[in-house]
UniProtKB/Swiss-Prot annotation:
Motif stretch (Hinge region): 356-360
Species of origin: Anopheles gambiae (African malaria mosquito)
Disruption outcome: RNAi-mediated knockdown in female causes spontaneous melanization leading to the formation of melanotic pseudotumors and a shortening of lifespan; spontaneous melanization is reduced in double SRPN2/CLIPB9, SRPN2/CLIPB10 and SRPN2/CLIPB4 mutant backgrounds. During the mosquito midgut infection by the rodent malaria parasite P.berghei, severely reduces oocyst numbers due to an increase in ookinete lysis and melanization. Does not affect ookinete formation. Causes proteolytic cleavage of CLIPA28 and CLIPC9 in absence of E.coli infection.
Protein name: Serine protease inhibitor 2
Assembly and binders: Forms a covalent heterodimer with protease CLIPB9; the interaction inhibits CLIPB9 protease activity. Forms a covalent heterodimer with protease CLIPB10; the interaction inhibits CLIPB10 catalytic activity. Interacts with CLIPB4 in the hemolymph of immune-challenged female mosquitoes; the interaction results in CLIPB4 inhibition.
Length: 409
């Protein structure tokens, strides 16, 4: 029986907020966002869950881009179906632009900043008998800051511990387990990306003990939630096109911000999601202006994990999971070259939001296998389900996204 050779993709993300008051001199990103895939992927996940969700579309996309890089071919100008499909879905038509984009973002994330912690890291955990092709190693390291570590999948307990320890280290201990020994059965390569963010609100909320009020979930029955409140000048818009209010809360450091999309009382989260696409969201964010806003938000803290194979197939990424997968630049060695496919993509994420700020984290894993085997004071009262996302505003990159159906803190 042939050994199954898996490539696993794992993602992890973490977000934490704290704050000391500081002037917000940095407004929303005004350029063209590259978020078509992000929104399509997020909407696919959201529609399958009637509960709280948090995930990192960025973490998924960077690993899929690394798989895209491996789908290149040395046979003249031929383009494999694997590469064509990935390019179409994740919008990698210009690979030089894509590489420059990731390199710029990752180098920016590595800069020391006293106002926030942002850590993005990618690692290949490769079986001893697999040799990753030098050209691919150079591409992965130079443009995506990806590192490589040799492990022995014949000892899955030790390898799982190695991977989990790496994830824990890069998320400040918030994520302790992304793989288990059983989940590594047949694996030859595991690609892991982690993203960790701990930020301070530019304008922290006053801490008030036991500020408990009703939260009206989709089922109509109110539950109690702990709220935080403040008045201040914030970027805000009530979008008629989306049928929702949009609020921006910046973090210290003039780099990142959190956006909240609150459906109007006569709309639901799903109805707003149906109206959101790259163009409509860009327009809604463009129309945001500084207003005096009375902000009421629930505090929340939760983790979320999801197998991503099915959602990704629903948005058009199918070939990497099939017997027809073509990843010739990834590796060579016994049972590797032209004989690997992606078996599993998995993400685990978490988020904490309170008066001081937020903490969020996510890890994504990909496993490859042998393929043979306004006017006046605005009121923003988030006492009903809403959507949120955290953006790196230097490039308009959506790092985290989620929805709240029942705030638990």
């Amino acid at each position: 029986m042939n050994k199954l050779n898996f490539v696993i993709l794992c993602l992890a993300a973490l977000l934490v907020f704290d704050a000391t008051a500081q002037q917000d001199v940095h407004g929303p990103f005004q350029g063209q966002r590259q978020n078509e895939f992000d929104l399509m992927f997020v909407k696919e996940i959201f529609k399958n869950h009637n509960s709280n969700v948090v995930l990192s579309p960025f973490s998924v996309k960077i690993l899929l881009t690394l798989i895209y890089e491996a789908s290149d071919t040395s046979f003249g100008n031929a383009v494999s179906n694997t590469k064509r499909e990935l390019s179409s879905v994740i919008q990698n038509d210009n690979i030089d632009h894509t590489r420059s984009y990731y390199k710029q973002l990752l180098e920016s994330a590595q800069q020391d900043n006293k106002d926030y912690d942002l850590n993005i890291a990618t690692n290949f955990f490769v079986d001893d008998f697999i040799e990753v092709i030098n050209k691919y190693q150079q591409i992965a390291n130079t443009h995506y800051h990806a590192m490589l570590e040799k492990v022995s999948y014949s000892n899955p307990t030790q390898t799982a511990a190695t991977i989990n320890n790496w994830v824990s280290e890069h998320t400040n201990g918030r994520l302790r387990e992304i793989v288990t020994p059983d989940s590594l059965e047949g694996a030859v390569i595991t690609l892991v990306n982690v993203i960790y963010f701990k930020g301070l609100w530019t304008y922290p909320f006053p801490e008030v003990a036991n500020n408990v009020k009703p939260f009206y979930g989709t089922r109509g029955k109110p539950t109690n939630a702990q709220y935080m409140e403040q008045n201040g000048q914030f970027y805000y818009d009530n979008s008629a096109d989306l049928g929702a209010q949009i609020l921006r809360l910046p973090y210290r450091g003039n780099k990142l911000a959190m956006y909240f999309i609150l459906p109007n009382p006569d709309n639901t989260v799903n109805q707003v999601l149906d109206r959101i696409n790259s163009a409509s969201l860009h327009q809604a964010l463009w129309y945001m202006e500084e207003n005096e806003v009375n902000v009421t938000l629930p505090k929340f803290k939760f983790d979320f994990s999801e197998q991503l194979n099915e959602p990704l197939q629903q948005v058009g990424i199918r070939e990497i999971f099939s017997q027809n997968a073509s990843l010739p630049l990834l590796a060579r060695g016994r049972g590797a070259r032209d004989e690997v496919r992606v078996s599993r993509i998995f993400q685990k994420a978490g988020i904490t939001i309170n008066e001081l700020g937020s903490e969020a984290y996510a890890a994504t894993e990909i496993q490859l296998v042998n393929k043979f085997g306004g006017d006046g004071v605005q009121i923003f009262n988030a006492n009903r389900p809403f959507i949120f996302f955290i953006e790196d505003e230097t490039l308009g990159t959506m790092l985290f996204a989620g929805k709240i159906e029942n705030p638990v803190f």
